[in-house]
From Swiss-Prot:
Pathway(s) the chain acts in: One-carbon metabolism; methanogenesis from CO(2); 5,10-methylene-5,6,7,8-tetrahydromethanopterin from 5,10-methenyl-5,6,7,8-tetrahydromethanopterin (coenzyme F420 route): step 1/1
Alphabetical keyword list: Methanogenesis, One-carbon metabolism, Oxidoreductase
Family listed: Belongs to the MTD family.
Enzyme type, top EC level: oxidoreductase
GO MF terms, alphabetically ordered: ferredoxin hydrogenase activity; methylenetetrahydromethanopterin dehydrogenase activity
InterPro entries: MTD (IPR002844), MTD_sf (IPR036080)
EC number(s) stated in the UniProt entry for this protein: 1.5.98.1
Region (Disordered): 252-277
Example GO biological process: methanogenesis, from carbon dioxide
Protein name (database record): F420-dependent methylenetetrahydromethanopterin dehydrogenase
Catalytic activity, as annotated: 5,10-methylenetetrahydromethanopterin + oxidized coenzyme F420-(gamma-L-Glu)(n) + 2 H(+) = 5,10-methenyl-5,6,7,8-tetrahydromethanopterin + reduced coenzyme F420-(gamma-L-Glu)(n)
Amino acid sequence: MVVKIGIIKCGNIGMSPVVDLALDERADRKDIAVRVLGSGAKMDPESVEEVTKKMVEEVKPDFIIYIGPNPAAPGPKKAREILSQSGIPAVIIGDAPGLRVKDEMEQQGLGYIIIKCDPMIGARREFLDPVEMALFNADVIRVLAGTGALRIVQEAIDKMIDAVKEGKEIELPKIVITEQKAVEAMEFTNPYAKAKAMAAFTIAEKVGDVDVKGCFMTKEAEKYIPIVASAHEMIRYAAKLVDEARELEKAMDAVSRKPHHPEGKRLSKKALMEKPE
């Protein structure tokens, strides 16, 4: 059986570029077919409504993942309304502001995954250009991957795939990814590696707070420019901590790897030269 997965990307968070790729890292899975629709950087209600309706009415997947910033904003709110009435199981993946509508999403019959270490970018014109945007997202992706947050998202979606394959009702995830949940998912062997990953996660959480201050709470350019610049320096160092954590695990030949089998089963290994089982 091939499970058809629909992914809607409106706007961008750090998880957005990799959420589909994490399900099929070598492009050799035979049990899934992924279809992605998006509205680029925009997440206004009209753009979101267009792609969400197209996913529901034309693609008609077995389940839908909607991913983007701030699930409480007007655009994502429109998507939630459409998805809750579609009859198709759906999950909202978002950043920390989504905590404000966690209960509302549950009442709408939607699943959710809130990623607390996926921070807002420093979106001030004097500071943010395409290069800075790309560097920031590259650092965030490293933090998501190295702390375990990415693995939690991937495994939650894999469980939904398993349910469809087994003919069972999909149990929609209701997950808030905290630092403790993330590092547990990474199965660190070296306690110092775990500590570095925890530090990276916590710094990434604070990056969002600093960027909110710089983007929405500070009006003077001479004040908000260094504020958002400081947030980007923070995420750069969080990414360095993740690299250091992984190097410690490499030194012990204990990096946790969980590749997919072509039939979809999750395999596991730690020693570099052993086969995953």
